[in-house]
């Protein structure tokens, strides 16, 4: 019997708020579990135990049925998020089911684990965590993942994204970009107030940070080919979950 998939949330249709497919209409499947514990994580409930009672162990067919029940025929794209969904070898059955139904799959991971099913992902964002996260990137593992994708002719489906909270993070991002210059590269403003319910104050704060980051990138000759993004869903809905 296939091993179940630990699911915390299924929601949508909405839009993707981050990375290479920002603005893309999508459904979301959020899995539980992560091998990191980033200091500023905006989805810590996926790994800190606070939502343990909410985890549902589901088969690929059950997840797909719930997606269709919620989204009907109003979607052709599914984003798998976490936590770190790359920890789940058993996701292969679900991704294959999406492919069988002509539904594109997107996934974001920090780049610590490679899975063979990465080659089935249409939009794969690898987001190594910067110093502000208090995590340390293993570049050997990241090298292995990106080399494996290239060997499987999947370089067109992958991008790199680094979340920026401070100048040290920006320097880290430049190091990543220099190491992998041929991979599309995105910088994104980090949300440093993931608990506030004052949406207007949060939006003004994040837009100010976004402008400051754009100003820095604009004059940096090492960042001529990067794209600088806001966290779009936060500007629309604040810290609300399930949107």
Swiss-Prot record:
NCBIfam families cross-referenced by the UniProt entry: Bsubt_queE
GO function terms (MF aspect): 4 iron, 4 sulfur cluster binding; carbon-nitrogen lyase activity; magnesium ion binding; protein homodimerization activity; S-adenosyl-L-methionine binding
The name this protein goes by in its record: 7-carboxy-7-deazaguanine synthase
Residues annotated to bind Mg(2+): 43
Job description of the protein: Catalyzes the complex heterocyclic radical-mediated conversion of 6-carboxy-5,6,7,8-tetrahydropterin (CPH4) to 7-carboxy-7-deazaguanine (CDG), a step common to the biosynthetic pathways of all 7-deazapurine-containing compounds.
Entry annotated with the keyword Iron: yes
Catalysis performed (reactions): 6-carboxy-5,6,7,8-tetrahydropterin + H(+) = 7-carboxy-7-deazaguanine + NH4(+)
Chain ranges of the Radical SAM core domain: 21-239
Assembly, per entry: Homodimer.
Cofactor binding summary note: Binds 1 [4Fe-4S] cluster. The cluster is coordinated with 3 cysteines and an exchangeable S-adenosyl-L-methionine. Binds 1 S-adenosyl-L-methionine per subunit.
Binding locations of substrate: 15-17, 30, 81
GO terms under biological process: queuosine biosynthetic process
Keyword terms: 4Fe-4S, Iron, Iron-sulfur, Lyase, Magnesium, Metal-binding, Queuosine biosynthesis, S-adenosyl-L-methionine
Protein EC: 4.3.99.3
